A protein has these predicted regions:
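Membrane-interface amphipathic/juxtamembrane segments adjacent to transmembrane helices
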Residues: 22-73
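Charged, low-complexity cytosol-facing tails and large interhelical loops of integral membrane proteins
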Residues: 156-241
Length: 241
């Protein structure tokens, strides 16, 4: 079956976006998501593995959300410093979120409509111009606010190259910026402060189940790892009302 250029282009946009959205995490990591002041937390599923890590896909419809990684174990292997002032990071995000949503609409709605209805003529070129104008505007905003966003010139250059070389990658710009920061060294306390009580209770129950699975996989019952997991589990359950 031969697919038309239009169909292949749309499939390519979707495929590149989903590929760029995928995150490889360790088994003891949590994913925190911030969306317009509201927080949620996810435990990556152990069903999807790649290169010894867990494969996590954030919600593809919420590219304007920020994503942070944090480890629930006491082992700290992050090289980046802990994020001290969340407000400095969030301050430039309002305008950037608008641009990300605009780019998503251009790629997911306007581009397919123009190609299938109007073809690949002048209208198609106009859409491409609007896409790159939006991307350049995003990058200019990021460059101006790079200090608040915790980016040096090398990091910015890497983000800019990805966004310009492949427009679907630019949709994940906010996620890539937030993933460069370590949210906190005690994610359980952070979750207790940011989540609604019922959401925190559900999160603790899910993490408790994960800890039980980790304990079952331990070969030695009294190993240092087992003792650490048991102690961590007791402290975790003690945080429930």
């Amino acid at each position: 079956m031969n697919l038309s250029f239009e169909v292949l282009l749309i499939l390519g946009v979707l495929g590149f976006y989903l590929y760029d959205s995928a995150i490889l995490v360790f088994s003891n990591e949590l994913i925190f998501v911030e969306s317009y002041g509201r927080w949620s937390v996810s435990l990556p599923s152990a069903r999807w593995r790649l290169m010894g890590k867990l494969l996590f896909f954030p919600n593809p419809l919420k590219a304007d959300s920020l994503i942070f990684r944090s480890a629930w174990s006491t082992t700290n292997y992050y090289s980046n410093p802990e994020l001290e002032d969340m407000s400095k990071l969030l301050a430039p995000m309002g305008f950037l979120r608008i641009l990300v949503l605009l780019l998503k609409v251009l790629l997911a709605i306007v581009l397919p409509f123009v190609m299938f209805r109007l073809g690949t003529g002048v209208e198609f070129l106009m859409v491409l111009f609007l896409m790159y104008f939006t991307i350049i505007s995003m990058l200019c905003c990021v460059y101006i606010k790079r200090t608040n966003l915790g980016l040096d010139k090398k990091a910015f250059a890497s983000l800019a190259f990805d966004a310009i070389a492949c427009p679907p990658f630019a949709i994940n710009l906010l996620r890539k910026i937030s993933l460069r920061h370590v949210l906190c060294k005690n994610p359980i306390e952070f979750a207790a402060k940011k989540l609604e009580p019922h959401s925190f209770k559900r999160f603790v129950e899910e993490l408790d189940k994960k800890l039980s699975e980790e304990l079952e996989c331990e070969d030695e019952e009294n190993s240092l790892r087992s003792i650490e997991l048991i102690k961590y589990r007791e402290n975790l359950l003690g945080m429930l009302p």
